Amino acid sequence: MGVMWGLISVAIASLAQLSLGFAMMRLPSIAHPLAFISGLGAFNAATLALFAGLAGYLVSVFCWQKTLHMLALSKAYALLSLSYVLVWVASMLLPGLQGAFSLKAMLGVLCIMAGVMLIFLPARS
């Protein structure tokens, strides 16, 4: 049950990260506070994505809390790294997120996946 909550948390956090990325590429830079605030007041897709991403992180924290009650931290923490994989893949597949493929990034993703698999392998008796 703890793994399920962890995977739900990872999925929601990944969606939240993608949503925030979408919003930040479309909203005015926060370096220009007045333009940024007026951009938030426009209530367009970027503003909705920003608030959806923030809400997603909040829900993800609730799921993560449930995970930590049911799963050892050493295993739960390994699940978080799957979010990097999901966001990387989604940023390349979804239009407008400007993700780029590179062999170096692919090697990093493979290392993450191998590490998670090693942590979740059953212990020898």
Curated annotation (Swiss-Prot):
Its main location: membrane. Pathway: Bacterial outer membrane biogenesis; lipopolysaccharide biosynthesis. Keywords: Cell inner membrane, Cell membrane, Lipid A biosynthesis, Lipid biosynthesis, Lipid metabolism, Lipopolysaccharide biosynthesis, Membrane, Transmembrane, Transmembrane helix, Transport. It is found in: Cell inner membrane. InterPro entries: Flippase_ArnF, Small_drug/metabolite_transptr. One of its GO terms (cellular component) is plasma membrane. It comes from the Bacteria. It is a multi-pass membrane protein. Residues 1-2, 55-76, 122-125 are cytoplasmic. Residues 24-33, 98-100 are periplasmic. The chain crosses the membrane at residues 3-23, 34-54, 77-97, 101-121. One of its GO terms (biological process) is lipid A biosynthetic process. GO terms for molecular function: carbohydrate derivative transmembrane transporter activity. The keyword Membrane applies. Belongs to the ArnF family. Translocates 4-amino-4-deoxy-L-arabinose-phosphoundecaprenol (alpha-L-Ara4N-phosphoundecaprenol) from the cytoplasmic to the periplasmic side of the inner membrane. Heterodimer of ArnE and ArnF. HAMAP family: Flippase_ArnF. This is Probable 4-amino-4-deoxy-L-arabinose-phosphoundecaprenol flippase subunit ArnF.
